[in-house]
Each structure stands twice: as C-alpha cells, then as structure tokens.
Amino acid sequence: MRGNAPTLKDIILYDLPTCDPTTCDTPPVDLYCYEQFDTSDEDDEDDDQPIKQDIQRYRIVCGCTQCGRSVKLVVSSTGADIQQLHQMLLDTLGIVCPLCACVE
C-alpha cells in the first residue's frame, strides 16, 4: 500500500471465484459455528472453588523511617492487596533499613 488512504485494490489481493448456486458443484462455505457444549455435574463443581487471582511481583522503593536511606523490597501479591499495602505505607506503616534495624 502506498499513499495516505487504502484503496480497494490494496486490500483485495486476488479475486474470489463467484459461483452461481444452481450451476456450481461446490457449495459456498458455511461460516456458522454449530458447536454445542455438554453440560455436566463436573462443571458445576468448579463453581464452588474460589477464583484464583493473578499474583504478580511488585518492586517497592521507599525511605527508611529512621535514617532516610532508600529501601528496596520485592513482594509477590495480588493487585488488591498491593493497593492495601500502598495505603498502609501512606498512613502509619514504616519500613526500616537493615542498618537501623540492627542498631535498635
């Protein structure tokens, strides 16, 4: 394709054969999906199990509450739980670096 706007010539690379249903020996392709799913008791049992949430790793960088040094943490959590941790860090929860933890 060259130019600012696509043309029909750019999109259609080859002509599809046209076929009259009365004279054509091959029927047109049926694109309808006839798939059916079986219902069973096993599927109902899966509904009782809790939904497994996606657990991801998060890198947290914050300052030590004692000396102000940068403290890096890597945690594994769900998105909802990491939001709770974020709120706790904004409120009263403080992280202490290893050097300050040894002193006290």
Curated annotation (Swiss-Prot):
Zn-finger region bounds: unnamed: 64-100
Subcellular location: Host cytoplasm; Host nucleus
GO CC term, one of those recorded: host cell cytoplasm
Protein name: Protein E7
UniProt GO molecular function: DNA binding; DNA-binding transcription factor activity; protein domain specific binding; zinc ion binding
Motif segment (Nuclear export signal): 82-90
HAMAP family: PPV_E7
SUPFAM superfamilies in the cross-refs: E7 C-terminal domain-like
Annotated region (E7 terminal domain), positions in chain: 1-49
Location, primary (coarse class): host cell
GO biological process, any: symbiont-mediated suppression of host innate immune response
Lineage: Viruses, Monodnaviria, Shotokuvirae, Cossaviricota, Papovaviricetes
Post-translational modification: Highly phosphorylated.
Function: Plays a role in viral genome replication by driving entry of quiescent cells into the cell cycle. Stimulation of progression from G1 to S phase allows the virus to efficiently use the cellular DNA replicating machinery to achieve viral genome replication. E7 protein has both transforming and trans-activating activities. Induces the disassembly of the E2F1 transcription factor from RB1, with subsequent transcriptional activation of E2F1-regulated S-phase genes. Interferes with host histone deacetylation mediated by HDAC1 and HDAC2, leading to transcription activation.
Pfam family for this entry, one: E7
Subunit structure: Homodimer. Homooligomer. Interacts with host RB1; this interaction induces dissociation of RB1-E2F1 complex thereby disrupting RB1 activity. Interacts with host EP300; this interaction represses EP300 transcriptional activity. Interacts with protein E2; this interaction inhibits E7 oncogenic activity. Interacts with host TMEM173/STING; this interaction impairs the ability of TMEM173/STING to sense cytosolic DNA and promote the production of type I interferon (IFN-alpha and IFN-beta).
Family label: Belongs to the papillomaviridae E7 protein family.
Organism listed in the record: Human papillomavirus type 32
UniProt KW keywords: Activator, DNA-binding, Early protein, G1/S host cell cycle checkpoint dysregulation by virus, Host cytoplasm, Host nucleus, Host-virus interaction, Inhibition of host innate immune response by virus, Inhibition of host interferon signaling pathway by virus, Interferon antiviral system evasion, Metal-binding, Modulation of host cell cycle by virus, Oncogene, Transcription, Transcription regulation, Viral immunoevasion, Zinc, Zinc-finger
Motif (LXCXE motif): 31-35
Domain commentary: The E7 terminal domain is an intrinsically disordered domain, whose flexibility and conformational transitions confer target adaptability to the oncoprotein. It allows adaptation to a variety of protein targets and exposes the PEST degradation sequence that regulates its turnover in the cell.
